[in-house]
């Protein structure tokens, strides 16, 4: 919004410069986007009076003038302007004056000779001094303009224009009054309101149309007043034209200019109807479906039924709060009008203007909220301006009000200590009361709080933090010192990141590279990686792209596309891992976000080399997974079970448990799934991070190694092939007690001399006591106990050789 500094200072005039004023507004939250003078720089131009005009002896279109600029002798100036006359006062550029030019260097006035006649200066039109005017010729100044006065001073051309960025919540600042109110509070100065006479002293007008408001929620306050016998020969006063032009508005005709002037001055949009075009009575209602109206911009629109319109018996006259209609528009011949001033609910105006591609000053203000107590004052101001300038007569006011539907202004309780807690410094309650009172709040001070009722023009005040912001910005952000809060905080060390980093390093040491991707996935890929254990696929309401439209249920959804990308670029050996969240659930309400680590591997065990290589297998994957476990973990705590996940190979996959707690899964991607993704044999795994971190945090007591010798005993047994190695090892450990310090499988045999459906397994048992050297009898007893347990529990047969 552009606004004139001179206009602002008519309302409040602080003792500071233009730059200081702009800085004050910026620091108060009203950012100054630009600041510039009304006219570009020039010098040497004064007010002069033409005292004689004679025809040039050698040029039909030139005149020789004598001009009084307050010097001892008048200046002789040759002029070609058609409107030069004796007695007129004009801007005079004296010799040495520098006028503005498009190239920025300036145009210097020198003594000249035009067709044999000396010319000592130049009489100026508006364009020569960087102004706009619709008159072809000299800029005629008022007759009371003081001769010899610098024209910049007389016309106020050093007046600064402030281009202010108004934030959406500050609709109350879309006017001179609103900005001046802020300046008055910042500088603790009174606001100088213009004198607005009582608007009730009017003549009675029998022709005034009746008004009905059927949409009271959308329009709870509506004023209409007639003005008749308007003299249209009177032009808009220059001071009003200047104010509008400097605010970025074009001068149209006097009646339209008045409504625009009041809009900029007070912030209330008004609309004038040509009274002679109104048929019957006025009704404020919602539009009828498919009702049409031709607007002032000659655009004909079809309404849908939720737009608010001002209508007469013939149809819609205006799109309320947005733009008037052409049928009732004010023209240069209009002499009788009815003037509208109303409060329209922001919800009734919002989005309607954009629907029809309209953006008007009125809609911009009504959408953000206009003071609902302002319509009567603005109407009185406009009526006074029109009647005082044109000598017209104002008619009666028709007022339709429904206070039940006006915006409520609920009191807000502000604890005094809360201000200190948020801002960080003590502000005296009396200062808070002054600031809030000057901002228009009704303030009731209590022992430990302030009860504040927002003014009618503040639609952005609802919670105590809003009040604290108002206090802080008026008190001055520059006056609030940067003091660090004194807090006693217990900073507990969180080792999650460090432990996770150690797991990542273990995978990197085994040839894996880390991938970082979105938590979103392709719905088609999720369908391939489907299993009832993973719940439902949760779709995003606003996906960033079609291939990232759902939440991933496993990290494979992110890793497999990475594998595809690399295989398509002749990378035959691929290793990736990723840490992140997987999202499992049947709906948003039961969604579980699990921090996980996943790996994927394709290709040979090693990079291409001169020595024999081989394809990756399940045990290589198992080895890589176990690198994520602490080295000190007892293998007896680890258990594997066959996995039932549909997207894994049923014979090459497993579930991992630690201390009977489910940790994750690993195995070969199901061949059918791999085929649909154009992948070769692919090994995958995913583990939950939480149990892995718990394991890593375990504290283990340091024990002294036994100084007594170890004893090894080997046993070979025949067992059914469907009995897992893990089950047999568990049985051995339970039967052996504390003397068994280590155990491993060193031979597997199936074939000749081994019955069908069985296999021969050979185990190494390491026995050791911490207190004594074990005797042969003690070792034999312990070994026999293990063999007996295997025989009883698994029908194992001890092999002699």
UniProtKB/Swiss-Prot annotation:
Record keyword ATP-binding present: yes
Subcellular location: Cytoplasm
GO BP term, example: phenylalanyl-tRNA aminoacylation
UniProt key word Protein transport: no
Cofactor(s) in the UniProt record: Mg(2+)
Enzyme Commission no: 6.1.1.20
GO molecular function: ATP binding; magnesium ion binding; phenylalanine-tRNA ligase activity; tRNA binding
GO cellular component terms attached to this protein's record: phenylalanine-tRNA ligase complex
Binding site for Mg(2+): 460, 466, 469-470
Catalytic activities: tRNA(Phe) + L-phenylalanine + ATP = L-phenylalanyl-tRNA(Phe) + AMP + diphosphate + H(+)
Domain spans labelled B5: 407-482
Top-level taxonomic group: Bacteria
Annotated tRNA-binding domain residues: 39-152
Cofactor note: Binds 2 magnesium ions per tetramer.
InterPro entries: aa-tRNA-synth_II/BPL/LPL, B3/B4_tRNA-bd, DNA-bd_dom_put_sf, Fdx_antiC-bd, Fdx_antiC-bd_sf, NA-bd_OB-fold, Phe-tRNA-ligase_IIc_bsu, Phe-tRNA-ligase_IIc_bsu_bact
Keywords: Aminoacyl-tRNA synthetase, ATP-binding, Cytoplasm, Ligase, Magnesium, Metal-binding, Nucleotide-binding, Protein biosynthesis, RNA-binding, tRNA-binding
FDX-ACB domain segment(s): 706-799
Known partners and oligomeric status: Tetramer of two alpha and two beta subunits.
Family: Belongs to the phenylalanyl-tRNA synthetase beta subunit family. Type 1 subfamily.
Protein name, as recorded: Phenylalanine--tRNA ligase beta subunit
Gene assigned in the entry: pheT
């Amino acid at each position: 919004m552009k606004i004139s500094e001179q206009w602002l200072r008519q309302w409040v005039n602080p003792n500071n410069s233009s730059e200081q004023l702009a800085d004050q507004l910026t620091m108060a939250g009203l950012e100054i986007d630009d600041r510039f003078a009304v006219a570009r720089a020039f010098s040497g131009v004064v007010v002069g009076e033409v005292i004689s005009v004679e025809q040039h002896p050698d040029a039909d279109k030139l005149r020789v003038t004598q001009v009084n600029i307050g010097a001892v002798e008048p200046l002789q100036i040759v002029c070609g302007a058609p409107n030069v006359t004796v007695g007129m006062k004009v801007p005079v550029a004296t010799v040495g004056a520098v006028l503005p030019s498009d190239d920025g260097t300036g145009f210097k006035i020198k003594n000249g000779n035009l067709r044999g006649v000396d010319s000592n200066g130049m009489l100026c039109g508006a364009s020569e001094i960087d102004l706009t005017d619709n008159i072809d010729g000299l800029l005629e100044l008022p007759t009371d303009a003081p001769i010899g006065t610098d024209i910049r001073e007389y016309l106020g051309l050093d007046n600064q224009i402030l281009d202010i960025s108004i934030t959406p919540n500050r609709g109350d600042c879309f006017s001179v009054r609103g900005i001046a109110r802020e300046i008055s509070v910042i500088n603790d100065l009174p606001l100088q309101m213009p004198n607005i006479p009582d608007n009730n002293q009017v003549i009675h007008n029998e022709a005034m149309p009746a008004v009905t408001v059927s949409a009271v929620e959308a329009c709870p306050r509506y004023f209409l007043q007639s003005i008749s016998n308007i003299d249209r020969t009177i032009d808009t006063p220059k001071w009003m034209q200047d104010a509008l032009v400097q605010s970025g508005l074009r001068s149209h005709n006097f009646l339209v200019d008045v409504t625009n002037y009041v809009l900029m001055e007070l912030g209330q949009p008004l609309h004038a109807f040509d009274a002679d075009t109104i048929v019957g009575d006025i009704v404020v209602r919602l539009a009828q479906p498919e009702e049409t109206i031709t607007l002032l911009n000659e655009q004909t629109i079809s309404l849908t039924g939720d737009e608010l319109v001002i209508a007469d018996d013939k149809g819609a006259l205006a799109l309320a709060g947005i733009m008037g209609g052409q049928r009732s528009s004010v023209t240069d011949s209009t002499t009788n009008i009815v003037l509208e001033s109303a409060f329209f609910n922001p919800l009734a105006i919002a989005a309607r203007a954009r629907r029809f591609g309209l953006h008007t000053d009125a809609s911009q203000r009504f959408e953000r909220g206009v003071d609902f107590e302002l319509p009567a004052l603005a109407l009185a101001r406009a009526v006074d301006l029109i009647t005082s300038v044109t000598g017209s007569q104002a008619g009666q006011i028709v007022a339709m009000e429904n206070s039940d539907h006006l915006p409520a202004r609920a009191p807000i309780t502000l604890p005094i200590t809360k201000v200190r807690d948020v801002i960080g410094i003590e502000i005296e309650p009396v200062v808070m009361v002054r600031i809030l009172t000057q901002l228009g709040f009704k303030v009731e001070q209590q022992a430990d709080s302030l009860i504040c009722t927002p003014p009618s023009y503040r639609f952005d005040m609802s919670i105590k933090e809003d009040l604290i912001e108002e206090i802080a910005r008026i008190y001055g952000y520059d006056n609030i010192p940067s003091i660090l809060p004194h807090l006693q905080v217990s900073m507990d060390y969180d080792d999650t990141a460090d432990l996770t980093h150690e797991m990542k390093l273990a995978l990197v040491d085994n040839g894996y590279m880390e991938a970082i991707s979105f938590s979103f996935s392709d719905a088609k890929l999720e369908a391939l990686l489907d299993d009832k254990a993973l719940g439902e696929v949760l779709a995003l309401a606003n996906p960033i792209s079609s291939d990232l439209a759902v939440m991933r249920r496993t990290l494979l959804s992110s890793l497999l596309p990475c594998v595809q990308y690399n295989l398509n670029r002749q990378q035959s050996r691929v290793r990736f891992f990723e840490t992140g969240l997987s999202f499992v659930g049947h709906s948003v309400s039961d969604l579980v976000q699990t921090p996980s680590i996943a790996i994927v591997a394709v290709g040979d065990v090693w990079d291409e080399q001169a020595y024999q290589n081989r394809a990756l297998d399940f045990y290589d994957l198992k080895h890589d997974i176990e690198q994520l476990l602490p080295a000190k973990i007892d293998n007896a705590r680890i258990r594997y079970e066959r996995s039932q996940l549909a997207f894994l190979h049923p014979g090459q996959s497993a579930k991992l448990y630690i201390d009977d707690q489910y940790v994750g899964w690993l195995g070969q991607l199901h061949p059918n799934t791999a085929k649909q993704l154009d992948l070769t044999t692919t090994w995958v795994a995913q583990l939950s991070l939480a149990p892995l971190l718990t394991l890593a945090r375990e504290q283990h007591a340091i024990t002294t190694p036994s100084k007594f010798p170890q004893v090894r005993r080997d046993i070979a047994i025949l067992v059914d092939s469907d009995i897992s190695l893990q089950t047999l090892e568990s049985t051995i450990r339970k039967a052996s007690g504390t003397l068994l310090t280590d155990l491993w499988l060193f031979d597997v045999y199936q074939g000749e001399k081994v019955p069908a459906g069985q296999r021969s397994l050979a185990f190494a048992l390491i026995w050791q006591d911490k207190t004594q050297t074990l005797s042969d009898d003690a070792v034999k007893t312990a070994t026999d106990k293990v063999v007996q347990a295997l025989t009883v529990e698994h029908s194992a047969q001890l092999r002699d050789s």
